Amino acid sequence: MPNKSKPNRLIAEKSPYLLQHAHNPVDWFPWGEEAFAKAKRENKPVLVSIGYSTTCHWWPGIIKSCGTPLKDNRSHFKR
């Protein structure tokens, strides 16, 4: 789902699946210590997308509309 926004950190990845999400408005992380360290530091859960794009035909709609819902629902994940 390309757009004209600045690419996120996935732009540096080699995986075609990750690269197709490099211009999403979501601040995605590739699998790795950086994501888990941030989650631990902020006391937040980690949402894992397994990268099986053929099962995610609904993902673009969620990504497109997620800005406000994600911001509004962050409080549900705080302890």
Swiss-Prot record:
InterPro entries: Ssp411 (IPR024705), Ssp411-like_TRX (IPR004879), Thioredoxin-like_sf (IPR036249). Gene3D superfamilies: Glutaredoxin. The gene is yyaO. It comes from the Bacteria. The lineage of its organism: Bacteria, Bacillati, Bacillota, Bacilli, Bacillales. This is Uncharacterized protein YyaO. SUPFAM superfamilies: Thioredoxin-like (SSF52833). It comes from Bacillus subtilis (strain 168). Transmembrane segments: none annotated.
